[in-house]
């Protein structure tokens, strides 16, 4: 007779362990689970733990050749979600041995790779991860981080200003470089390739890189400030991506860019290592994130994607605005902004932070606010995001009635006015409009911008509320 009992047994008998004491080395996950009708939450939570670790749908005799107790994921706590029927937060602990060191790719393949199509679940969302110190230390993280970036750029005590060059597609390389020059000359710190500017027939990447480098050097010479343009190195193959990054380094520019979700974590981590070794800053765009993070009950919350990016490596990442055209609830946005920038973040459910996270001195990432913002938003942005951020105005620069350079001037004046007002102890939330109006009295460029955008609002209810 065989030495094990074949057949299908309930997951919860093996994988639901409410008495388990989590270890400091465990990776912890908080899943929002919506079971199918008739499936008890313990079984659903245990199924998630099983299918994302050692389990399969039936008992297999090779289980006897290893120690399941050592390697299995465990659902150790379940709580109902307030105000939602049939939704539960299931906490799962994974032993660290299940994961390859320094690989975000492997971490996600394990934790979210298979389990989201599971039939016993109606929907599943990964809300947060706790990355243990032992695992954090296997990653190099951001190529440089916030402090080193400020030192490289010699810019302190204020947010940095950016602008995405529009129209995003269709300009020739020379006209593109001209727009870059005008924005940098007017007072911005950075300009940006749009996420889908790679190497298209109307503008091949090398032509763009050369004209943008020329624009950067010309603007630096005329302003005495260090300037940058996020040259998008994203490409169809990793080899081609690295070729573009090498070209950027040879041109002596300070920063390149990558679309980390469409490009993939493996490519991103390779690029981050190259940037660290060669003194390039790395700007990260999150194109495709809403496919993954928009639904409340299914997918992955952006805070998980943000944590993963900090591990994989990037110096800037787009993080919503709280005030513009793209979604973002204030407290929740600030929660993952802190996860990107700070060294130690306390658990705080009101901000969507399910676990205390210690980054043990891994460099921080600058959050980038962009999407439908303009000069009237400047006081709110300065107050919400603080100094360690990049504020990016695409249309809010290039849409200025007098042209690109005056648009840049308007944003720089508005920013400097807000920072000065804050440093003098004024309340940006209450006096914001007043501060902008005062500044516009001596800056005709700002006055013109204020007039154009005085009535623009993108007001919809946020999708993501706790």
From Swiss-Prot:
Record has Plastid as a keyword = yes
Q: How is it modified after translation?
A: The disulfide bond which can form in the large chain dimeric partners within the hexadecamer appears to be associated with oxidative stress and protein turnover.
Q: What's the main place this protein lives? A: plastid
Where, per the database record, does this protein carry N6,N6,N6-trimethyllysine? Answer: 5
- Note on how the cofactor is bound: Binds 1 Mg(2+) ion per subunit.
Q: Which residues bind Mg(2+)?
A: 192, 194-195
Location in the cell reads: Plastid, Chloroplast
Where does the chain bind substrate?
114, 164, 168, 286, 318, 370
State the source organism's domain of life. Answer: Eukaryota
Q: Which reaction does it catalyse?
A: 2 (2R)-3-phosphoglycerate + 2 H(+) = D-ribulose 1,5-bisphosphate + CO2 + H2O; D-ribulose 1,5-bisphosphate + O2 = 2-phosphoglycolate + (2R)-3-phosphoglycerate + 2 H(+)
Pfam families for this protein:
RuBisCO_large (PF00016), RuBisCO_large_N (PF02788)
Which co-factors does it depend on? Mg(2+)
GO MF annotation: an example: ribulose-bisphosphate carboxylase activity
Modification type N6-carboxylysine: residues: 192
**What is the stated purpose of this protein?**
RuBisCO catalyzes two reactions: the carboxylation of D-ribulose 1,5-bisphosphate, the primary event in carbon dioxide fixation, as well as the oxidative fragmentation of the pentose substrate in the photorespiration process. Both reactions occur simultaneously and in competition at the same active site.
Fill in the subunit field for this protein. Answer: Heterohexadecamer of 8 large chains and 8 small chains; disulfide-linked. The disulfide link is formed within the large subunit homodimers.
Family statement: Belongs to the RuBisCO large chain family. Type I subfamily.
Report the protein name in the record. Ribulose bisphosphate carboxylase large chain
